[in-house]
Swiss-Prot record:
Subcellular location: Cytoplasm
Encoding gene per record: ung1
E.C. number: 3.2.2.27
Name by which UniProt lists this protein: Uracil-DNA glycosylase 1
GO CC annotation terms, alphabetical: cytoplasm
HAMAP family (UniProt xref): UDG
Residues annotated as the enzyme's active site: D61
Organism listed in the record: Listeria innocua serovar 6a (strain ATCC BAA-680 / CLIP 11262)
Length: 221
C-alpha cells in the first residue's frame, strides 16, 4: 500500500503501459486541444491527498469543451456554465440535505474535505467524448481503485450509472460502502437518481465510522 499519491504516481510511471499512455496523451496535445491541461490532469490527487480520502465519486470522461475540465469529475471552473448533470446533482443535494444550489460548478471544496472526484478516463480531445478511453486509462484507474480497496479506513464509493458501477467492480473490501445509482444526466436522472439521497447516506456512514462528515454546501466558506 502506498502512503501518498506522489508515491503511487512514481510507482505507475515505471510501468510500460503508463509510459505508453503518457506518450499518447503528449502526442495528442501536440496535434490539438486536450482537456484538462497537463498541470490539471491529476489535480484530484493534489486537492484530495491520499491520507485524507473519505469518499470517491467516480465519473467517466472529462468535459470536452474549452475551459471546462480541470481534473475533478463533474466539476467545472468557476466562471463556466454549470453542466446539466451537475445541475441535477445540485437538485438532489437540495432535496436530500436542503442545501441551496451553488451559482458555480467548482467542486474543489468537496475535494479538499476528502472527496476524490476522479474519472475513469483522465484526458479527452476537444469535442470528442471518450476519445482517450482506449489509451490505457482503464488500467490506471484499476490501479487507483485497487489502492483504495485496500485503504486502511472505511470509504464511500458513489457510483452513478452502469459505467461507474462496472469500473468499480474490483471494490470488494466489506468495510467500504458502495452507493450505486442512476447517472445524474438529464437522460437518466428521473429514472432513480432523484430521491436516492447519496449525500445523507454518505455522511451517516462516515459518522458511524467516526469520520468527519462532508460539508456539501458550496455556498458556505
Amino acid at each position: 500500500m502506498v502512503k501518498t499519491w506522489d508515491e503511487f504516481l512514481e510507482q505507475e510511471a515505471k510501468q510500460p503501459y503508463f509510459i505508453e499512455l503518457m506518450k499518447a496523451v503528449s502526442e495528442a496535445r501536440e496535434e490539438g486541444n486536450v482537456y484538462p491541461s497537463e498541470e490539471d490532469m491529476f489535480s484530484c490527487f493534489r486537492l484530495c491527498p491520499y491520507d485524507k480520502v473519505k469518499v470517491v465519486i467516480l465519473g467517466q470522461d472529462p468535459y470536452h469543451g474549452p475551459g471546462q475540465a480541470h481534473g475533478l469529475s463533474f466539476s467545472v471552473q468557476k466562471d463556466v456554465r454549470i453542466p446539466p448533470s451537475l445541475r441535477n446533482i445540485y437538485k438532489e443535494l437540495k432535496s436530500d440535505l436542503d442545501i441551496d444550489p451553488a451559482n458555480h460548478g467548482y467542486l474543489a471544496k468537496w475535494a479538499e474535505q476528502g472527496v476524490l472526484l476522479m474519472n475513469t478516463s483522465w484526458s479527452v480531445e476537444e469535442g470528442k467524448a471518450g476519445s482517450h478511453k482506449k489509451l490505457g486509462w482503464a488500467t490506471f484507474t484499476d490501479h487507483v481503485l485497487e489502492e483504495l480497496n485496500n485503504y486502511d479506513k472505511p470509504l464511500v464509493f458513489i457510483l452513478w450509472g452502469n459505467h461507474a458501477i462496472k469500473a468499480a467492480s474490483g471494490i470488494t473490501n466489506p468495510k467500504h460502502l458502495l452507493i450505486k445509482g442512476v447517472h445524474p444526466s438529464p437522460l437518466a436522472a428521473s429514472r432513480g437518481f432523484f430521491g436516492s439521497k447519496p449525500f445523507s447516506k454518505t455522511n451517516e456512514f462516515l459518522k458511524e465510522n467516526n469520520r468527519t462528515p462532508i460539508d456539501w454546501d458550496l455556498n458556505s466558506k
